[in-house]
UniProtKB/Swiss-Prot annotation:
Its cofactor is pyridoxal 5'-phosphate. It comes from Pseudomonas aeruginosa (strain ATCC 15692 / DSM 22644 / CIP 104116 / JCM 14847 / LMG 12228 / 1C / PRS 101 / PAO1). GO terms for cellular component: cytosol. GO terms for molecular function: branched-chain-amino-acid transaminase activity; L-isoleucine-2-oxoglutarate transaminase activity; L-leucine-2-oxoglutarate transaminase activity; L-valine-2-oxoglutarate transaminase activity. GO terms for biological process: aspartate biosynthetic process; isoleucine biosynthetic process; L-leucine biosynthetic process; L-valine biosynthetic process. Pfam families: Aminotran_4 (PF01063). This is Branched-chain-amino-acid aminotransferase.
Length: 307
């Protein structure tokens, strides 16, 4: 089933449109130049009902991204929150992946963005583990990419922008063609930045390390894991991380809304730790899934019921 050929509805500029009718013109500006921003959000089945995890944080980042790109979203944050709930609710989804996107219309061509209408869509559909259930249990193989992560002054790394993900796609395609599952990207100075679409953590001697958010996205799942790790008593250090530090780590894992908490078992042919999901990773992974699925009362404010 293609993404275009599905039953259901998509929130499109304030209206719930039939899925197959949610189309736009081939001369839409963002399709040609990549100037747009988006989010990846998840909803989970909880004992209280379907709940969107950290909805407000995602909506805030969407607006921050648009502001960085100088795009004016024609709706309030509350309206986008309610539209996100509606996209899940009206598709009768117990759990879902949600894609809000802000993009320019087809009022003109060329690099000047003046006079272009800003559109907003929000789609929601069922989507399981990003790299498969086995990856969550056994971990994945990672390859260091030959493609450098963006310099902070090239693509505005605090914005989750459409065009920036060309860099991610090139890195991921290279990794997969080389027999890996995911890429590890370095910043312009050669330090570890992130995966193609995930933040990275390593554990060494019981201390959890993660790169500073300079060349990587300030991930919402990353921030969630930092909170959970602190609550579990782990020492946390945000710093520059070298490639060889990853090689000799006891454990490593990726985080992201799509990837959730995915262990890394191998990097560049080198086994990480015991070559499987480590105990710290497993503990944080369980804490994360307990949190998003409402098995704990902690951080109830991060779970927004759709009904």
């Amino acid at each position: 089933m293609s993404m275009a050929d599905r039953d259901g509805v998509i929130w499109y500029d304030g209206e719930l449109v039939q899925w197959r009718d949610a189309t736009t013109h081939v001369l839409t500006h963002t399709l040609h130049y990549g100037m747009g921003v988006f989010e990846g959000v998840r909803a989970y089945d909880t004992p209280q009902g379907t709940a969107i995890f950290r909805l407000q944080a995602h909506t805030d980042r969407l607006f921050d991204s648009a502001h960085i790109m100088n795009m004016q979203i024609p709706y309030s944050r509350d309206e986008i929150n309610e539209a996100t709930r509606a996209a899940v609710r009206e598709n009768n989804l117990e759990s879902a992946y949600i894609r809000p996107m802000v993009f320019y219309g087809s009022e003109g061509m060329g690099l000047r963005a003046s006079g272009l209408k800003v559109h907003v869509i929000i789609a929601a559909w069922s989507w399981g583990a990003y790299m498969g259930e086995e990856a969550l249990q056994q971990g994945i193989k990672v390859r260091t990419s030959s493609f450098t992560r963006h310099h902070v002054n090239i693509s505005m790394t605090r914005a989750k922008s459409n065009g920036a993900y060309i860099n991610s796609m090139l890195a991921l395609q290279e990794a997969i063609s080389g027999g890996a599952d995911e890429a590890m990207m370095l910043d312009p100075e050669g330090y570890v930045a992130e995966g193609s679409g995930e933040n990275i953590f390593i554990i060494k001697d019981g201390v959890i390390y993660t790169p500073e958010v300079t060349a990587c996205l300030n991930g919402i799942t990353r921030n969630t894991i930092l909170t959970l790790a602190a609550e579990h008593g782990f020492k946390l250090v945000e710093k520059r991380i070298t490639r060889d530090e990853v090689y000799i780590a006891d454990e490593a894992f990726f985080t992201g809304t799509a990837a959730e908490v995915t262990p890394i078992r191998e990097v560049d042919g080198r086994k990480i730790g015991a070559g499987r999901r480590g105990p710290v990773t497993e503990k944080l992974q369980k804490a994360y899934f307990d949190l998003v699925s409402g098995k704990t009362e902690a951080h109830a404010e991060w779970r927004t019921l759709v009904k």
